[in-house]
Amino acid sequence: MAEFVRAQIFGTTFEITSRYSDLQPVGMGAFGLVCSARDQLTNQNVAIKKIMKPFSTPVLAKRTYRELKLLKHLRHENIISLSDIFISPLEDIYFVTELLGTDLHRLLTSRPLEKQFIQYFLYQIMRGLKYVHSAGVVHRDLKPSNILVNENCDLKICDFGLARIQDPQMTGYVSTRYYRAPEIMLTWQKYDVEVDIWSAGCIFAEMLEGKPLFPGKDHVNQFSIITELLGTPPDDVINTIASENTLRFVKSLPKRERQPLASKFKNADEQAVDLLERMLVFDPKKRITASDALAHEYLAPYHDPTDEPVAEEKFDWSFNDADLPVDTWKIMMYSEILDYHNVDASGASAAMGEFNGQ
């Protein structure tokens, strides 16, 4: 049975196995607190994310289960990787991943990025997205703070808690507003992997300019700012809007012409502007794919078609429509954790006590 030690971080109890020491707070998210720590087994620095009260509601339990399944399945150089997972005696879940030191948001707020860094970062983002999308997964919440970077400029996409199956009937607002694709704002109902390409385009623009491209104060203002640059959406896009209120709002806006991005990004080279034009397209089906973006001339210095892998198999989303009680999600979670630790999962419910120190 694992031995647990306790520490207070920002008034929150961190209850971790004795394998980890030197806890330091890194950041606080909506669903958990992240600390850095020293893994005494590997002598490496790691990040430990505490999921707060994962079994308090079926929705939270399912969300945590989804993130765990995704972290186990997605194995790629540009995706954050899971190195350990455990449940504390207080029934909080802890994900342990590699520690990268900083994120793109912090980099962008500290200094302008030079061209070669912008190229290399965008290349790695698109390389990661090619893999994620090939697994049948949409990240949905891509933003600079979810893109981790180390001192060697290695980049990894993190925070897959909101990720969802590729499904033409996806529902709900999810990503941070500045980076949110228009189809999410306009319809709520039909979106796919292309939302990640839009978000990556917004991040690309921010790397080029040093500030957010579409800093909307609210959803109405956000959409208005987008149309000022990209013009009024084409009729075939407008006709996909399911909400009558949204449809009326869009049709009430003044007609605007798309502005050439070269006039906005005067210091960027032609290839950068051309790729950005292909990413920031209203019609999702006309947006460039991650795979095609990697082959674009702008990313030629890094493009290697023999080293841009796709997933070996699609992610299994069969659980995603399930409406289950907390206790069932809990047993499924324990089963996944036992599987991760190469323990026979057939007795997951009986083994629950061992994993929370009972």
UniProtKB/Swiss-Prot annotation:
Disulfide feature: none
Matching PROSITE patterns: MAPK, PROTEIN_KINASE_ATP, PROTEIN_KINASE_DOM, PROTEIN_KINASE_ST
Gene Ontology molecular function: ATP binding; MAP kinase activity; protein serine kinase activity
InterPro entries: Kinase-like_dom_sf (IPR011009), MAP_kinase (IPR050117), MAP_kinase_CS (IPR003527), MAPK_p38-like (IPR008352), MAPK_Sty1/Hog1 (IPR038783), Prot_kinase_dom (IPR000719), Protein_kinase_ATP_BS (IPR017441), Ser/Thr_kinase_AS (IPR008271)
Residues holding ATP: 26-34, 49
Motif TXY in this chain: 171-173
Keywords: Activator, ATP-binding, Cytoplasm, Kinase, Nucleotide-binding, Nucleus, Phosphoprotein, Serine/threonine-protein kinase, Transcription, Transcription regulation, Transferase
Activity regulation summary: Activated by tyrosine and threonine phosphorylation. Hypoviruses like CHV1-EP713 induce inactivation by lowering the degree of phosphorylation in response to various environmental stresses.
Compartment annotation: Cytoplasm; Nucleus
Top-level class of the enzyme under EC nomenclature: transferase
Stretches that traverse the bilayer: none
Notes concerning its domains: The TXY motif contains the threonine and tyrosine residues whose phosphorylation activates the MAP kinases.
Name of this protein: Mitogen-activated protein kinase HOG1
Gene name as annotated: HOG1
